[in-house]
């Protein structure tokens, strides 16, 4: 069974990323990492996260580069691409998944209600630093895993793990599943 780790809004926080990678590798055994943008830089409106180290964050991500699919966030710049050994400049990416489609984007450009998505498709986004788990009228599930390093809601860092049956929201500090959502209900 394929397992995706879904991570957003790292903002260069090496300590949070190191913890997430440890959990993803050793507890959840992730096959692939879906990065939803805002990878290295915190941007002018965010505070600098505790543990901020863009160089170390790059090294950690480059160590799994063959298993990363990423999209650009509003704080990501072309110069960030020079630090990373996998593409991060696409505004969106689409992945076939269990007869449906995963549409991944950062969340500042695309409106899931106007995209050509169908019932059962999964719209993954970040950007708001707030967890979102909602099914639109057209049957598309919108999911935001929150922020790894600068969370707003909930107040702790989160990421998600996704397999063929469900998507689970994980508390970065405790490794506990705080939300589990079946995909096909």
Where are these regions (language model features)?
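Anion-binding (especially nucleotide phosphate/pyrophosphate-binding) glycine-rich loop
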Residues: 181-185
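Core catalytic region of metal-dependent phosphoesterases/phosphodiesterases
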Residues: 3-97
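Conserved beta-sheet core of the metallophosphoesterase superfamily
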Residues: 86, 90, 98-103, 108-172, ...
């Amino acid at each position: 069974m394929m397992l995706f780790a879904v991570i957003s809004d790292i903002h260069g926080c090496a300590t949070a990323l190191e913890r997430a990678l440890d959990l993803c590798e050793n507890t959840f055994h992730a096959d692939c990492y879906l990065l939803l943008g805002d990878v290295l830089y915190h941007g002018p409106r965010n505070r600098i996260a505790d543990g901020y180290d863009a160089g170390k964050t790059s090294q950690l991500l480059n160590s799994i580069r063959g298993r990363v699919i990423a999209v650009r966030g509003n704080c990501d710049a072309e110069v960030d691409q020079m630090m990373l050994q996998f593409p991060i400049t696409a505004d969106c990416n689409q992945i076939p998944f269990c007869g449906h489609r995963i549409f991944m984007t950062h969340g500042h450009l695309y409106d899931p209600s106007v995209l050509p998505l169908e019932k059962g498709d999964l719209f993954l986004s970040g950007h708001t630093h707030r967890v979102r788990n909602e099914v639109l009228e057209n049957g598309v599930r919108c999911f935001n895993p929150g922020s790894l390093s600068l969370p707003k809601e909930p107040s702790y860092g989160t990421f998600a793990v996704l397999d063929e049956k469900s998507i689970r929201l994980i508390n970065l500090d405790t490794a506990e599943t705080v939300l589990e959502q079946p995909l096909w209900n």
